[in-house]
From Swiss-Prot:
Function recorded in the entry: Component of the 26S proteasome, a multiprotein complex involved in the ATP-dependent degradation of ubiquitinated proteins. This complex plays a key role in the maintenance of protein homeostasis by removing misfolded or damaged proteins, which could impair cellular functions, and by removing proteins whose functions are no longer required. Therefore, the proteasome participates in numerous cellular processes, including cell cycle progression, apoptosis, or DNA damage repair.
Cross-link annotation Glycyl lysine isopeptide (Lys-Gly) (interchain with G-Cter in SUMO2), location: 300
Family, as annotated: Belongs to the proteasome subunit S14 family.
Organism of this sequence: Mus musculus
Record protein name field: 26S proteasome non-ATPase regulatory subunit 8
GO cellular component: proteasome accessory complex; proteasome regulatory particle
UniProt GO BP: proteolysis
Coiled-coil parts of chain: none
Assembly and interaction partners: Component of the 19S proteasome regulatory particle complex. The 26S proteasome consists of a 20S core particle (CP) and two 19S regulatory subunits (RP). The regulatory particle is made of a lid composed of 9 subunits including PSMD8, a base containing 6 ATPases and few additional components. Interacts with DDI2. Interacts with TASOR.
Region (Disordered): 1-25
Residues in PCI domain copies: 165-334
């Protein structure tokens, strides 16, 4: 249809058709609207892009796993488990740090400050390995032995540093390995020595009830025959008997050098008890006699201890305690008041009957 010599316009959005020359031409689609994704070639392009992105992510993940496996195992084999590979890496790092600590500790004069820093770093690494086993954790034998060896060095380091609270913490952690895992782990060479030190520590702090509680956890054979356990048990018996001279003599028969620290604390405690009794029982005591009773080997040590206690040596070489003793009137018994209370109590009982 022609209007004024021109062909009629095809409505917008419809394909144009042509029959020039008697032949039908192919349908020509109009260009797509900008931003439209409804055309087939747009859908094909978006699908291709998604496939490329997926393949890229898979390739990156495979490369990352290969790098992790190469770092942990020293090869290009892909690790089968991410958490397992991490645990192996942490264990290897802890083992390397432990070897450094062990080398420093085994020196003739170890650097205690350096050992303390190494122990601090190792404890942080062990936290990632659950070095205190619980019911829900499953640790390998290698992990348990490594953690136990580190804690044993920590306990001995605490004694050399004279850090009693630190020693008590290390021993509380070691008991888990000594008692709960004694069937799964080989016996440690330092187990009896450290358990004996723990008993001596409780004895030096006058924690007798805890001493007997720990003693009950040990086999009877170890108590009777093991030299590390037998020594603190004998000291406790001497204290109960009041044989203080045997306690002082036992210092020269210690099973290990590390026992000296707690033995000295125990002897100082005993000296303080004896000195308190001297102040109550004697009005005055000769210098030589005080030196013998308090088990001092030299007069200088006796003089230093007397100054610490506030004792003053008189002109006749006597220590006088008359001013420190209670006056007779302070120790009188209120017999009249006690008699009245007893009579009143008897009267009330008679009324009840």
């Amino acid at each position: 249809m022609f209007i004024k010599g021109r062909a009629a316009k095809t409505p917008r959005g419809e394909p144009r058709r042509s029959s020039r020359g008697g032949r039908k031409l192919a349908v020509v689609a109009p260009p797509p609207v900008l931003g439209s994704t409804s055309r087939p070639h747009f859908r094909r392009e978006s699908i291709a892009r998604r496939r490329c992105r997926k393949s890229g992510r898979r390739l990156a993940a495979s490369r990352k796993m290969a790098a992790t496996a190469a770092t942990v195992n020293g090869s290009t084999t892909v690790s089968s488990s991410g958490p397992a590979a991490t645990s192996v890496g942490i264990l290897q790092a802890a083992a390397g740090m432990y070897e450094q600590l062990k080398d420093e500790w085994n020196r003739k004069n170890p650097n205690l400050s350096k050992c303390g820093e190494e122990l601090g770093r190792l404890k942080l690494v062990l936290l990632e390995l659950n070095f205190l086993p619980t019911t829900g954790t499953k640790l390998t034998k290698q992990q348990l032995i490594l953690a136990r060896d580190i804690l044993e060095i920590g306990a001995q380091w605490s004694i050399l540093c004279k850090d009693i609270p630190s020693f008590e913490r290390y021993m509380a952690q070691l008991k888990c390995y000594y008692f709960d895992y004694k069937e799964q782990l080989p016996e440690s060479a330092y187990m009896h020595q450290l358990l004996g030190l723990n008993l001596l520590f409780l004895l030096s702090q006058n924690r007798v009830a805890e001493f007997h509680t720990e003693l009950e956890r040990l086999p009877a054979k170890d108590i009777q025959t093991n030299v590390y356990i037998k020594h603190p048990v004998s000291l406790e018996q001497y204290l109960m008997e009041g044989s203080y001279n045997k306690v002082f003599l036992a210092k020269g028969n210690i099973p290990a050098e590390s026992y000296t620290f707690f033995i000295d604390i125990l002897l100082d405690t005993i000296r303080d008890e004896i000195a308190g009794c001297i102040e109550k029982a004697y009005e005055k005591i000769l210098f030589a006699e005080a030196t013998r009773i308090l088990f001092f080997s030299t007069p200088k040590k006796m003089t230093d201890y007397a100054k610490k206690r506030g004792w003053v040596l008189g002109p006749n070489n006597y220590y006088s305690f008359a001013s420190q003793q209670q006056k007779p009137e302070d120790s009188t018994i209120p017999s009249t008041e006690l008699a009245k209370q007893v009579i009143e109590y008897a009267r009330q009982l008679e009324m009840i009957v």
